[in-house]
């Protein structure tokens, strides 16, 4: 066997082995997407309705509550960026991190300092490599988050939000500086093909006209009675609201991660098929050239023997 043919066949074996890995990862991601979609569908209504409930309570409450009352001159904001723990998911993590950088740049342009809270090793490694400050980080569950994970993240964010600016709160994760706003950056799962990075403000809650004026269409404004008080109701809703928003964002990001990884692995598998076909053609051409050379050598040797025999006679 010629040296060139051996090289081609060695490369084919290597590509085939890689194809088996990418194909297996594609199938695993495809099987996990279904469950991830179901979890997103199950959590979204609760998160949406809780947000509407908070908006309704805040709209008809005369109390100034941190949940809905914006600081006149905000000086620091917390930004939660949700990425992946593992790679091989295309541009999924990079897109979320880039969206976070755009949000941070916009906040800094408004004169607002930022505290970065990160979920996923990709974001953590990105920040550490660039020597950026990290207020809090969580890893190891990006592709399968639970409500307990979301609650842990939400508690850190709430602690920072309820701490006055300039003060520091001591937690298990370390010292947290007080912030005036909470923002979250995650990847919204729209379909198997489309997943978009999204930046949204969680606190103070931005009341939309559709939320505040749901009753306007009927011409009647609802009357609310708060027991024991509107402030205590909002205090009770605050952690639930943040936990629900964070959990839903984590689930959306997990589903997006699986979809992105499946798409990336399918592309890698297809590329491996094309490369195998190309190497097969090159190997066949090399084999044909080798056979042609062997035939030429045999014919040449036969002619030489025939000429030698004729000369001896």
What are these regions (language model features)?
Residues 1-313:
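C-terminal beta-strand-loop-alpha-helix "lid" module of Rossmann-like NAD(P)-dependent dehydrogenases
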């Amino acid at each position: 066997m010629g040296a060139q043919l051996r090289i081609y066949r060695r490369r084919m074996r290597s590509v085939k082995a890689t194809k088996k890995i990418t194909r297996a990862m594609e199938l695993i991601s495809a099987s996990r997407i279904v469950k991830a979609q179901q979890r997103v569908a199950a959590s979204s209504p609760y998160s949406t309705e809780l947000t509407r409930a908070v908006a309704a309570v805040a709209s008809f409450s005369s109390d100034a509550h941190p949940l809905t009352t914006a600081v006149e001159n905000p000086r620091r904001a917390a930004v939660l960026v949700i990425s992946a723990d593992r790679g091989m998911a295309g541009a999924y993590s990079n897109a979320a991190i880039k969206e976070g950088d755009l949000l941070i740049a916009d906040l800094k342009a408004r004169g607002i300092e930022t505290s970065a809270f990160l979920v996923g090793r990709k974001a953590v490694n990105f920040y550490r490599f660039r020597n950026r400050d990290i207020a809090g980080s969580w890893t190891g569950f990006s592709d399968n988050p639970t409500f307990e994970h979301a609650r842990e993240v939400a508690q850190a964010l709430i602690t920072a939000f309820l701490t006055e600016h300039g003060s520091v709160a001591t937690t298990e994760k370390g010292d947290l500086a007080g912030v005036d706003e909470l923002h979250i950056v995650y990847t919204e799962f729209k379909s198997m093909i489309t997943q978009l990075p999204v930046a949204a403000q969680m606190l103070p809650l931005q009341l939309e006209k559709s939320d505040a004026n749901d009753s306007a269409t009927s011409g009647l404004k609802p009357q609310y009675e708060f027991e024991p008080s509107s402030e205590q109701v909002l205090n009770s809703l605050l952690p639930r609201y943040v936990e629900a928003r964070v959990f839903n964002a984590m689930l959306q990001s997990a589903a997006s991660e699986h979809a992105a990884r499946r798409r990336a692995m399918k592309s890698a598998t297809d590329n491996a098929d094309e490369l195998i076909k190309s190497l097969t053609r090159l190997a066949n051409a090399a084999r044909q050239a080798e056979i042609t050379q062997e035939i030429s050598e045999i014919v040449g040797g036969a002619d030489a023997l025939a000429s030698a025999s004729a000369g001896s006679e």
